[in-house]
């Protein structure tokens, strides 16, 4: 039960714990510090609940969202929007790929001699990798990254991107890395929705 709940160990304190500050060092600490700095900059620039929501969308820092705003998002069924997942990953990848292809289209002679689609796909892959890292890499974010990256890698190797085979590869990787996710509604709904979209595209 603990494994499926994501609990690796439990314990207790003999006395009241004293918070002395973060002591983590290395790359993970540098990434977390960068996330917090970006979130603080967004809050200072926008301010209010809007700034907190923007910070959640950009770097996945949701702790500062006021309870009133969170409750309003829940009542309207929009709370999932601030959880970085497939929608956000697709927007990042689509924006970068579209921008790269638009820029390369300005140089038709050069574009005719180079694999523009592969360059754009690679740029999109780099962009969503950076977004995964800076957003904290939660479960839904990692799953969305995996599905998108499989499709982009397929483009790099001149394969069809939107196929059930690529979706199956993504599912197999998820099952190998985190098998307990298969029983969760998030995994089931995201893969079911993606399968429906891929099937509709093929039809």
Residue ranges, per PLM feature:
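Hydrophobic alpha-helical transmembrane segments in multi-pass membrane proteins
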Residues: 11, 61, 66-203
């Amino acid at each position: 039960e603990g494994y499926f709940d994501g609990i690796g160990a439990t314990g207790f304190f003999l006395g009241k714990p004293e918070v002395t500050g973060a002591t983590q060092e290395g790359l993970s600490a540098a990434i977390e510090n960068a996330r917090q700095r970006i979130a603080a900059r967004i809050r200072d620039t926008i301010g209010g609940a809007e700034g907190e929501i923007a910070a959640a969308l950009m770097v996945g820092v949701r702790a500062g969202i006021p309870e009133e705003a969170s409750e309003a998002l829940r009542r309207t069924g929009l709370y999932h929007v601030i959880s970085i997942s497939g929608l956000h990953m697709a927007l990042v990848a689509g924006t970068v790929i579209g921008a790269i292809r638009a820029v390369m289209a300005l140089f038709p002679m050069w574009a005719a001699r180079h694999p523009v689609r592969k360059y754009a796909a690679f740029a999109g892959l780099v962009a969503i990798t950076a977004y995964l890292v800076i957003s904290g890499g939660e479960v839904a974010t990692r799953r969305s990254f995996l599905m998108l990256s499989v499709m982009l890698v397929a483009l790099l190797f001149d394969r069809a991107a939107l196929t059930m085979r690529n979706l199956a590869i993504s599912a197999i990787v998820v099952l190998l890395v985190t098998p307990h996710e298969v029983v969760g509604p998030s995994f089931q709904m995201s893969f079911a929705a993606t399968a429906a979209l891929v099937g509709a595209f093929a039809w």
